[in-house]
Amino acid sequence: MAQTDVLNVTGNKIGTVELKDSIFNIEPNYDVMFRYVDMQLANRRAGTAKAKTRSEVSGGGRKPWPQKHTGRARTGSIRNPLWRHGGVIHGPKPKDWSKKLNKKMKKLALKSALSLRFKEGNLVVVDDIKLDRPKTKQMREIVKNLGLSDAKKVLFILPWKRDEYENVKLSGRNIPGVKVIIADNPGNLVNGRSSNIDGLNVFDILNHEKIVFTVDLVRKIEEVLG
């Protein structure tokens, strides 16, 4: 099994944790990761864009002017797509952009993303992170203590106990390049809801340079993906 150091919020090493090779040390499958991210971004789309066609624009029931003897170009309706405020030709219509991926591929994509970051040395494990109240200054200190100040993007993924970690999430909102997400309940990691951007997901893992986990979350990930 692979090993990595466990740090506390002051940046001191307090032990080590073993990581399952089958989850954190596999050969990354870039094709499956692409498919997962493609699905995730597609599922974000509302698909509500809509433009009115000639038949849907209001007005235009009568001919604007006679066909002949005006010296003007002939036209039959103010709803003509060539007119300002007229209908739209081939405009967008409401559409379901959502995509699906089977559970096996979702698991492989998550394992691949985690393994990629671990092999790069960009996976940081802490014992726990908790704050009594939202405080950006304290969160900045934690980022600095963990040696992550120089990273362009840092992702904190915390356990699904939202009430316990809500202050940490709020404290990280105003720090540029820092994002804090509360992971889904482990049972939801590979179902449809795991593609939500506010849960453990491949897009955020790949989109951030450094990833910070708690020991509890590592164990739950191994339990579900193992």
From Swiss-Prot:
PANTHER family: 50S RIBOSOMAL PROTEIN L4, LARGE RIBOSOMAL SUBUNIT PROTEIN UL4M
InterPro entries xrefs: Ribosomal_uL4 (IPR002136), Ribosomal_uL4-like (IPR013005), Ribosomal_uL4_dom_sf (IPR023574)
Record keywords, A-Z: Ribonucleoprotein, Ribosomal protein, RNA-binding, rRNA-binding
Function: One of the primary rRNA binding proteins, this protein initially binds near the 5'-end of the 23S rRNA. It is important during the early stages of 50S assembly. It makes multiple contacts with different domains of the 23S rRNA in the assembled 50S subunit and ribosome.
GO cellular component terms attached to this protein's record: ribonucleoprotein complex; ribosome
Record carries keyword RNA-binding: yes
GO BP term (any one): translation
Organism of provenance: Kosmotoga olearia (strain ATCC BAA-1733 / DSM 21960 / TBF 19.5.1)
Domain of life: Bacteria
Classification of source organism: Bacteria, Thermotogati, Thermotogota, Thermotogae, Kosmotogales
Pfam family, one: Ribosomal_L4
Stated name of the protein: Large ribosomal subunit protein uL4
